[in-house]
Amino acid sequence: MNQTETTPIRVRKNWKTSEIETLFDEQAGRIDPRIYTDEDLYQLELERVFARSWLLLGHETHIRKPGDYFTTYMGEDPVVVVRQKDASIAVFLNQCRHRGMRICRSDAGNAKAFTCSYHGWAYDTAGNLINVPYEAESFACLDKKEWSPLKARVETYKGLIFANWDENAIDLDTYLGEAKFYMDHMLDRTEAGTEVIPGIQKWVIPCNWKFAAEQFCSDMYHAGTTAHLSGIIAGLPEDLELADLAPPKFGKQYRASWGGHGSGFYIGDPNMMLAMMGPKVTSYLTEGPAAEKAAERLGSIERGTKIMLEHMTVFPTCSFLPGVNTIRTWHPRGPNEVEVWAFTVVDADAPDDIKEEFRRQTLRTFSAGGVFEQDDGENWVEIQHILRGHKARSRPFNAEMSMGQTVDNDPIYPGRISNNVYSEEAARGLYAHWLKMMTSPDWEALKATR
């Protein structure tokens, strides 16, 4: 892509709160396209969304032993994630306090300490400054306790590692709220929990991070129309006819009561799952001992064996597909680019052949070269390209689908539930929470919106 196509569009500075409040109109279902392109809004996102939200960093099985570490990002801030001797996890800014060079330049490994390659300042695995070259001769008054990198709060949920820079933010359990119920469809099917398949895929898409987060939060609509038709046909089992693959009409969409999280799923017909993940994975998830145990653990046959092709986003940038078992973080790289970091989880006690089949099918479908992943990326990239036009940014997008069709008292599913899986209720929830974060000066103000 031409370099100019990813250059930020700067059209104004110093957005006022009253102006930001006009960018999303939930009652009318209107989205101002400038939220996907404006550089000044993006800089405010880094401060008010990414510096204050619980962000997914990885899985606990990425760092099994003391000293195991990996490097990743919180927003655009690089961080180091390290397993401690007491089995806890430390997360700290990957920035030396001397001149700002990275403390750790490796993707992952095991270490007893980290040494900056520029001037040799060294830090222990908790991020504490422990050694400064020529300290006695040149830094007579240096208090090393004052010169450690910034440390983040760390909490986990059923194997997933989250971190937050804001000491005043609510705890992770409260932040996730009802979303935990839906996360469990992938994370808690067995008492053994989940483990990662080794390796993280990383690729860059020239589009705004919100397009990706919104689709995984709310958009079953594209899957039920034409976007993935060619990939579905390619994966069609020989004993199924195309006529058998009419998209299911029964399903639900979940919008968090507060927090911007969302999910959607079909209920019942496994044929679409067969076309996407093949008979081996589909059988494992819907029938036999593993499915029966999952149904018992999750509390119903429907939750354990009947939910198909679920999609979900935990606000802002943690997304996954239970059943496909891909988990990814959408790392923002300016208003016009996102870096995707994706990994696959499996039930820790699943047979080896099932784990291998999940690995193979996820690579085929939702990976850097996956058939469905490329469909999604093509749409997002083209939208972002079109939004370089002045007129293209001047008219609102429609987000009216299934407005006024939610209930708050579903007998099984918590949160605000739409009984029409083809809904944009969760998308409206995501943008409504984005707006709260962009217009709230601190977490005390955010708590008041709950």
UniProtKB/Swiss-Prot annotation:
Keywords: 2Fe-2S, Aromatic hydrocarbons catabolism, Dioxygenase, Iron, Iron-sulfur, Metal-binding, NAD, Oxidoreductase, Plasmid. GO terms for molecular function: 2 iron, 2 sulfur cluster binding; benzene 1,2-dioxygenase activity; iron ion binding. Residues 56-163 form the Rieske domain. Belongs to the bacterial ring-hydroxylating dioxygenase alpha subunit family. Gene3D superfamilies: Naphthalene 1,2-dioxygenase Alpha Subunit, Chain A, domain 1, Rieske [2Fe-2S] iron-sulphur domain. Binds 1 [2Fe-2S] cluster. [2Fe-2S] cluster binds at residues 96, 98, 116, 119. This is Benzene 1,2-dioxygenase subunit alpha. It comes from Pseudomonas putida (Arthrobacter siderocapsulatus). GO terms for biological process: catabolic process. This dioxygenase system consists of four proteins: the two subunits of the hydroxylase component (BedC1 and BedC2), a ferredoxin (BedB) and a ferredoxin reductase (BedA). Pathway: Aromatic compound metabolism; benzene degradation; catechol from benzene: step 1/2. InterPro entries: RHO_NdoB-like_C, Rieske_2Fe-2S, Rieske_2Fe-2S_sf, Ring-hydroxy_dOase_2Fe2S_BS, Ring_hydroxy_dOase_asu_C_dom, Rng_hydr_dOase-A. Its cofactor is [2Fe-2S] cluster; Fe cation. PROSITE patterns: RIESKE, RING_HYDROXYL_ALPHA. It catalyses: benzene + NADH + O2 + H(+) = cis-1,2-dihydrobenzene-1,2-diol + NAD(+). Pfam families: Rieske, Ring_hydroxyl_A. The keyword Iron-sulfur applies. Its EC number is 1.14.12.3. The gene is bedC1. Fe cation binds at residues 222, 228. PANTHER family: 3-PHENYLPROPIONATE_CINNAMIC ACID DIOXYGENASE SUBUNIT ALPHA, CHOLINE MONOOXYGENASE, CHLOROPLASTIC.
